[in-house]
Amino acid sequence: MKRLFTSESVTEGHPDKVADQISDAILDALIEQDPDARVAVETLVTTGLAVVAGEVTTEAYVDIQDIVRRTILDIGYTRAKYGFDGETCGVVTSIHSQSPDIALGVNKALEAKEKNDDGDEFDKIGAGDQGMMFGYATNETPEFMPLPIVLAHQLAMRLSKVRKEKIVPFLRPDGKTQVTVEYSDDGKPMRIDTILISAQHDPNVTINELKEVLLEHVIKPTIPEQYWSDNIKILVNPTGRFVLGGPSADTGLTGRKIIVDTYGGWVPHGGGAFSGKDPTKVDRSAHYMARYVAKNVVAAGLADRFMIQVAYAIGKARPVSLMIDTFSTSKVDEEKLKDVIIQLFDFRPLAIINKLNLQRPIYKKTAAYGHFGRNDPDFTWESLDAVEELKRAFNI
């Protein structure tokens, strides 16, 4: 059966993404000084105000107010008429240390307690919380990501680029994109059905002018030729006007764009957000590891599509469960594939941190346009360095 599937993205000026970037900018500043910092920072942004709250345990000192203001200004909220201005907005902070009850399990995992510290080094740090995390990959795009979320991100990035480079000078920072793709009976993308762009703009711009310039400077340069058609339904600012935007129009919160951050709704999500969390939080690090495994499995040709779920208990280093699904696309025995994954990939938090080199100030740039499918050497979970090892396990 043919079906339509839709995914969305948002620009860096979207209120929730402003909050995510502030939280991750604070994390980067702390982890740059203290790689072992324990950080869980949440941000709220609204008209003229940014509120930062959370738990931090560290020897580092950072100027949170300065980080907040610089992040807002870098995004593009530089003028009071936007309703939110990094120079003049209020900044309120409420930061305290990590709960000692949580620290008991993170600082010394259950496995280390049971072995009286004589065990494996990677058994020493426990998961910072319970929960389940998902990783996914598909061979339908070069990014090993679903086509709808890839195109939605590319449109959002292009929308921001033409604003910042003043190619379209009347755009403002807030914006959203959405792409609907038709899939064939065998799950292959066939064509783009609908493209939706909502772009904040200056008040003197007409809707027809906006449609014309976005088609010329954003949509056509972004959509691959193989998917372009004059039959694509294109919607631009369907309400007819988008002048009021950003935090002055909608309150933004850290962690409210978890589907944008991951796979565009193509697979389940455990619910845990990424931004503002140091890598001992498996909400972040285990998601990255799961993506790493999934991408390498598909790139190795072991399946056309692959999903992995991993679950944790707070204070315990080793996952409590691991499940895989190839959606009937596996080229090898699935039970053996699961065994090989367990043998080759270590999902304990400290092992993930070491493997992916996560104790670095790399997180602010993950906080907009998706954590996965990005061509950036700092996104170590996108590496394909396990492909050959996986192939050898199956004598390929």
UniProtKB/Swiss-Prot annotation:
GO aspect biological process, one term: S-adenosylmethionine biosynthetic process
InterPro entries named among the record's database cross-references:
ADOMET_SYNTHASE_CS (IPR022631), S-AdoMet_synt_C (IPR022630), S-AdoMet_synt_central (IPR022629), S-AdoMet_synt_N (IPR022628), S-AdoMet_synthetase (IPR002133), S-AdoMet_synthetase_sfam (IPR022636)
Q: Which GO terms describe its molecular function?
A: ATP binding; magnesium ion binding; methionine adenosyltransferase activity
Q: Please list the residues that bind Mg(2+).
A: D16
**Keyword annotations from UniProtKB, A to Z:** ATP-binding, Cytoplasm, Magnesium, Metal-binding, Nucleotide-binding, One-carbon metabolism, Potassium, Transferase
Specify which residues bind K(+) according to the UniProt entry for this protein. Answer: E42
What Pfam families does this protein's entry cite? S-AdoMet_synt_C, S-AdoMet_synt_M, S-AdoMet_synt_N
Q: Where is this region: Flexible loop?
A: 98-108
Give, as in the UniProt entry, the pathway in which the protein acts.
Answer: Amino-acid biosynthesis; S-adenosyl-L-methionine biosynthesis; S-adenosyl-L-methionine from L-methionine: step 1/1
Where found in the cell?
Cytoplasm
- PROSITE patterns with a match to the protein in the record: ADOMET_SYNTHASE_1, ADOMET_SYNTHASE_2
**What cofactor is this protein dependent on?**
Mg(2+); K(+)
- Tell me its family: Belongs to the AdoMet synthase family.
Biological role stated in the UniProt entry = Catalyzes the formation of S-adenosylmethionine (AdoMet) from methionine and ATP. The overall synthetic reaction is composed of two sequential steps, AdoMet formation and the subsequent tripolyphosphate hydrolysis which occurs prior to release of AdoMet from the enzyme.
| Protein name as catalogued | S-adenosylmethionine synthase
Lineage of the species this protein comes from: Bacteria, Thermotogati, Thermotogota, Thermotogae, Thermotogales
Q: Which gene encodes it?
A: metK
